[in-house]
């Protein structure tokens, strides 16, 4: 029985004893409620069978008006908004915003605070890459890697919690330094119905000393943990079949689309703000920039693995310096930094400064600046304009994921539907920063 129909739904007209049929591509939605969408990505795919003809990313589902919110509050009350942009790379976002404010104020954080920022930027980089490799492997069917990666993420998020009290949205960086000195005692697990006896002692074994002791112990063990990830993935036949030659981005395409970070370095372009435009104390530590050759999903994976090794190396150097060089972590300037609790409770002028600072903030001289950091996903920048008031006149945020997502249509064409998932994973997109 012939069931061919026209676009209108009725039977196709007869011509020379045959029915006319119209063959057209199939349009389907990937996301926004899809585990491989990495957030609220809605990808409208035009398919020719299993082959992608066109990909149309729809953005805006996580738009929260962050830039406008930051313009409605004093400078020092908007740092928390930055954490919620790329919510996997929290402190790097803070760093860009804080650097922009410091540039307009004409101040510089103490050296110790800059080393702490450098160390936590790299802890954040490892957190991000662990999430990317774990979830990317899970998207392609390798579940074990995710469990391994989250084992290390748990330890690093404990470092976040030790300095700020929060596991994710830290608000630890402040104009003029950081919120507080590194704690002398690493918090320990307490006995509970889930953690008792031998397990509790094992978990607390590395927590007997300070935070620096805990981080140093982590840097000694982490290279072996990376070896475990590589054992599971790097030479895995199925992993290579799903990633080698998939989503190839040429150096020319990467630069034309404004790609940064691993997306650019994976294509063979050795551009890294930590080397080209050093900030914090990156010019005082020794590290290398991993660069790919093929520009495919597999090279981007290898770059992230190599970057974790380099981040571990930077963290170890920062720990050694911080041990040997005590000092202030915040400027002693009550116009931009709050007085200590002891000073506030013993000196009336310090109390006034404290109240004014947290109620109305401070006036930032009129001017404009752009401050950027090498975030785990690429160049995260903050363009800040001040008109001399206590609130920004304009805040514009450069999210690396937005430029990367813009290129998806060009790069994904001609690939199979299953390859789209692999490419989204190595693009490392988070919609908090894309939609802002």
From Swiss-Prot:
Subcellular location: Cell inner membrane
GO CC, one annotated term: plasma membrane
EC number assigned by the record: 7.1.1.-
Keyword Nucleotide-binding: no
PROSITE patterns: COMPLEX1_49K
Catalytic reaction(s) noted: a quinone + NADH + 5 H(+)(in) = a quinol + NAD(+) + 4 H(+)(out)
Keywords for the protein's UniProt record, in alphabetical order: Cell inner membrane, Cell membrane, Membrane, NAD, Quinone, Translocase, Transport, Ubiquinone
Membrane topology: Peripheral membrane protein
Pfam families for this protein: Complex1_49kDa
InterPro entries: NADH_Q_OxRdtase_suD, NADH_UbQ_OxRdtase_49kDa_CS, NDH1_su_D/H, NiFe-Hase_large
Top-rank taxon, per record: Bacteria
GO molecular function per UniProt: NAD binding; NADH:ubiquinone reductase (non-electrogenic) activity; quinone binding
Signal peptide as annotated in the record: none
NCBIfam families listed in its UniProt record: NuoD, PRK06075.1
Subunit structure, as described in the record: NDH-1 is composed of 14 different subunits. Subunits NuoB, C, D, E, F, and G constitute the peripheral sector of the complex.
Primary role: NDH-1 shuttles electrons from NADH, via FMN and iron-sulfur (Fe-S) centers, to quinones in the respiratory chain. The immediate electron acceptor for the enzyme in this species is believed to be ubiquinone. Couples the redox reaction to proton translocation (for every two electrons transferred, four hydrogen ions are translocated across the cytoplasmic membrane), and thus conserves the redox energy in a proton gradient.
PANTHER family: NADH DEHYDROGENASE [UBIQUINONE] IRON-SULFUR PROTEIN 2, MITOCHONDRIAL, NADH-UBIQUINONE OXIDOREDUCTASE 49 KDA SUBUNIT
Recorded family membership: Belongs to the complex I 49 kDa subunit family.
Record protein name field: NADH-quinone oxidoreductase subunit D 1
Gene source species: Stenotrophomonas maltophilia (strain R551-3)
Taxonomic lineage: Bacteria, Pseudomonadati, Pseudomonadota, Gammaproteobacteria, Lysobacterales
Originating gene: nuoD1
